[in-house]
Amino acid sequence: MKILVTGAAGFIGSYVVQRLLERGDEVVGLDNINDYYEVELKYGRLAECGIVKEEGGGDKLVHSRKWSAYRFIRMNLEDSQAMEMLFVNERFGRVCHLAAQAGVRYSITNPRAYIESNIDGFFNVLECCRWNRVEHLVFASSSSV
Protein backbone atom coordinates (compact mmCIF):
# COMPACT_ATOMS: atom_id res chain seq x y z
CA MET A 1 0.00 0.00 0.00
CA LYS A 2 1.42 3.40 -0.97
CA ILE A 3 0.88 6.06 1.68
CA LEU A 4 1.43 9.82 1.55
CA VAL A 5 2.53 11.40 4.84
CA THR A 6 2.31 15.19 4.88
CA GLY A 7 4.39 16.96 7.51
CA ALA A 8 6.95 14.17 7.16
CA ALA A 9 9.83 16.26 8.55
CA GLY A 10 7.88 17.21 11.66
CA PHE A 11 8.20 15.52 15.04
CA ILE A 12 5.11 13.32 14.71
CA GLY A 13 5.34 12.91 10.94
CA SER A 14 8.89 11.57 11.04
CA TYR A 15 7.89 8.88 13.53
CA VAL A 16 4.84 7.94 11.48
CA VAL A 17 7.04 7.57 8.39
CA GLN A 18 9.47 5.30 10.25
CA ARG A 19 6.72 3.07 11.65
CA LEU A 20 5.02 2.71 8.27
CA LEU A 21 8.32 1.76 6.65
CA GLU A 22 9.08 -0.73 9.43
CA ARG A 23 5.76 -2.48 8.81
CA GLY A 24 6.48 -2.70 5.07
CA ASP A 25 4.49 0.12 3.51
CA GLU A 26 5.68 2.21 0.57
CA VAL A 27 5.79 5.84 1.75
CA VAL A 28 6.07 9.23 0.11
CA GLY A 29 6.85 11.98 2.62
CA LEU A 30 5.94 15.59 1.92
CA ASP A 31 6.98 18.71 3.83
CA ASN A 32 7.61 22.34 2.94
CA ILE A 33 10.47 22.63 5.49
CA ASN A 34 9.34 26.10 6.57
CA ASP A 35 11.34 27.94 9.20
CA TYR A 36 8.69 28.26 11.92
CA TYR A 37 10.51 25.45 13.75
CA GLU A 38 14.25 24.87 13.47
CA VAL A 39 15.01 23.82 9.88
CA GLU A 40 18.09 21.81 10.86
CA LEU A 41 15.94 19.67 13.19
CA LYS A 42 13.68 18.88 10.25
CA TYR A 43 16.61 17.94 8.04
CA GLY A 44 17.96 15.83 10.89
CA ARG A 45 14.70 13.90 11.06
CA LEU A 46 14.78 13.40 7.31
CA ALA A 47 18.38 12.18 7.54
CA GLU A 48 17.29 9.51 10.03
CA CYS A 49 15.10 8.16 7.22
CA GLY A 50 17.90 8.38 4.65
CA ILE A 51 16.99 11.66 2.95
CA VAL A 52 20.09 13.78 2.32
CA LYS A 53 19.63 17.52 2.85
CA GLU A 54 21.42 18.49 -0.35
CA GLU A 55 19.12 16.25 -2.39
CA GLY A 56 15.92 17.29 -0.58
CA GLY A 57 15.34 20.66 -2.19
CA GLY A 58 13.15 21.56 -5.10
CA ASP A 59 10.01 19.83 -6.19
CA LYS A 60 11.35 16.42 -7.18
CA LEU A 61 10.98 13.13 -5.37
CA VAL A 62 14.18 12.13 -3.59
CA HIS A 63 14.94 8.48 -2.87
CA SER A 64 15.98 7.46 0.62
CA ARG A 65 19.45 6.03 1.08
CA LYS A 66 18.18 3.92 3.98
CA TRP A 67 14.74 2.68 2.90
CA SER A 68 14.06 1.55 -0.66
CA ALA A 69 10.34 2.12 -0.07
CA TYR A 70 10.71 5.77 0.97
CA ARG A 71 10.78 8.91 -1.14
CA PHE A 72 10.48 12.53 -0.07
CA ILE A 73 9.35 15.70 -1.80
CA ARG A 74 9.62 19.29 -0.60
CA MET A 75 6.33 20.90 -1.57
CA ASN A 76 3.70 23.34 -0.34
CA LEU A 77 0.21 21.92 0.12
CA GLU A 78 -1.28 25.14 -1.23
CA ASP A 79 0.29 24.48 -4.66
CA SER A 80 -2.79 22.79 -6.08
CA GLN A 81 -1.26 21.93 -9.47
CA ALA A 82 1.80 20.28 -7.93
CA MET A 83 -0.43 18.39 -5.49
CA GLU A 84 -2.68 17.18 -8.31
CA MET A 85 0.32 15.95 -10.30
CA LEU A 86 1.75 14.15 -7.27
CA PHE A 87 -1.53 12.35 -6.60
CA VAL A 88 -2.07 11.42 -10.24
CA ASN A 89 1.49 10.12 -10.65
CA GLU A 90 1.73 8.26 -7.33
CA ARG A 91 -1.80 6.85 -6.94
CA PHE A 92 -1.83 6.80 -3.15
CA GLY A 93 -4.09 4.31 -1.41
CA ARG A 94 -3.94 6.18 1.87
CA VAL A 95 -3.00 9.63 3.13
CA CYS A 96 -1.87 10.63 6.61
CA HIS A 97 -2.21 14.41 6.77
CA LEU A 98 -0.09 15.89 9.56
CA ALA A 99 1.17 19.09 7.90
CA ALA A 100 0.05 22.48 9.18
CA GLN A 101 1.31 25.91 10.05
CA ALA A 102 1.71 25.78 13.83
CA GLY A 103 1.76 28.37 16.59
CA VAL A 104 -1.04 30.45 18.04
CA ARG A 105 0.84 33.72 18.57
CA TYR A 106 2.21 33.74 15.03
CA SER A 107 -1.33 33.37 13.68
CA ILE A 108 -2.30 36.72 15.19
CA THR A 109 0.34 38.61 13.23
CA ASN A 110 0.41 36.38 10.14
CA PRO A 111 -3.12 35.06 9.55
CA ARG A 112 -2.56 34.65 5.80
CA ALA A 113 0.07 31.95 6.43
CA TYR A 114 -2.51 29.94 8.36
CA ILE A 115 -5.26 30.39 5.80
CA GLU A 116 -2.96 29.28 2.99
CA SER A 117 -1.50 26.26 4.77
CA ASN A 118 -4.19 25.06 7.14
CA ILE A 119 -7.29 25.85 5.10
CA ASP A 120 -6.28 26.07 1.44
CA GLY A 121 -3.65 23.35 1.81
CA PHE A 122 -6.03 20.99 3.60
CA PHE A 123 -8.69 21.69 0.97
CA ASN A 124 -6.18 20.63 -1.71
CA VAL A 125 -5.45 17.42 0.20
CA LEU A 126 -9.18 16.67 0.46
CA GLU A 127 -9.82 17.39 -3.21
CA CYS A 128 -6.85 15.29 -4.33
CA CYS A 129 -8.06 12.41 -2.17
CA ARG A 130 -11.56 12.72 -3.60
CA TRP A 131 -10.54 12.95 -7.26
CA ASN A 132 -7.98 10.15 -6.98
CA ARG A 133 -10.17 7.79 -4.97
CA VAL A 134 -7.88 7.51 -1.96
CA GLU A 135 -9.26 4.76 0.28
CA HIS A 136 -8.45 6.29 3.66
CA LEU A 137 -7.45 9.71 4.98
CA VAL A 138 -6.11 10.20 8.49
CA PHE A 139 -6.09 13.82 9.67
CA ALA A 140 -4.37 14.70 12.91
CA SER A 141 -3.43 17.93 14.58
CA SER A 142 -1.79 19.10 17.78
CA SER A 143 -2.50 21.78 20.34
CA SER A 144 0.01 23.97 18.53
CA VAL A 145 -2.03 24.21 15.31
Predicted regions located by residue number:
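N-terminal Rossmann-like NAD(P)+-binding domain of SDR-like oxidoreductases, especially those catalyzing
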Residues: M1-V145
